[in-house]
């Protein structure tokens, strides 16, 4: 499915992929949901997340935290508080370090709590996104705080694209767990 360029497509792709993500998770045996990722998963790609995330919980809290980034960024800027998407001191070159800090923050978060947090944050994101028009979501430069991108592009990245990433990793976990 191509990247969303309308509000309707954004909402449909975010909800659709979120539903597919949960179908995949709910289809896993409890034992596999709670199992650590196989060591070979760390070798599946060059991106930092392949070595960072050790289990399903780590991935779910990552998605949750990126929802929080999106929500806080939009809410702050709408309230007139000029804020970048990534919190200080991070930028787009250093955000992998931020992801590690987010990972550390949740090492004692139980899987069941991670699941409920993610479901609640997805709903909060969807509730906020529905308040914007097509123009507000997909017109470059409409909000000065989105820089050279659009609000919709940030939303796609924090929802549908991130859910695709999670499904890819979960499928790899299932495959390596059932060998």
Locations of regions flagged by a protein language model:
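Aromatic-glycine hotspot motif
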Residues: 1-57, 65-179
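Conserved H-X4-D acyltransferase segment
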Residues: 60
């Amino acid at each position: 499915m191509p990247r969303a360029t309308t509000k309707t497509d954004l909402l449909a792709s975010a909800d659709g992929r979120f539903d597919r993500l949960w179908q995949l998770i709910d289809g896993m045996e409890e034992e596999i949901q709670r199992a650590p990722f196989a060591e070979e998963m760390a070798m599946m790609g060059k991106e930092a997340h392949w070595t960072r995330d050790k289990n399903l919980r780590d991935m779910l809290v990552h998605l949750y935290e990126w929802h929080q980034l999106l929500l806080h960024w939009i809410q702050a800027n709408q309230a007139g508080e000029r804020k970048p998407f990534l919190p200080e001191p991070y930028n787009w070159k250093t955000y992998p370090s931020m992801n590690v800090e987010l990972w550390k923050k949740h090492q004692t978060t139980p899987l069941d709590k991670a699941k409920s947090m993610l479901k609640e944050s997805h709903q909060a994101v969807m509730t906020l996104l529905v308040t914007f028009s097509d123009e507000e979501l997909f017109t470059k430069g409409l909000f000065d705080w989105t820089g050279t991108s659009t609000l919709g592009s940030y939303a796609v990245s924090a929802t549908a694209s991130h859910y695709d990433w999670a499904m890819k990793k979960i499928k790899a976990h299932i495959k390596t767990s059932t060998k």
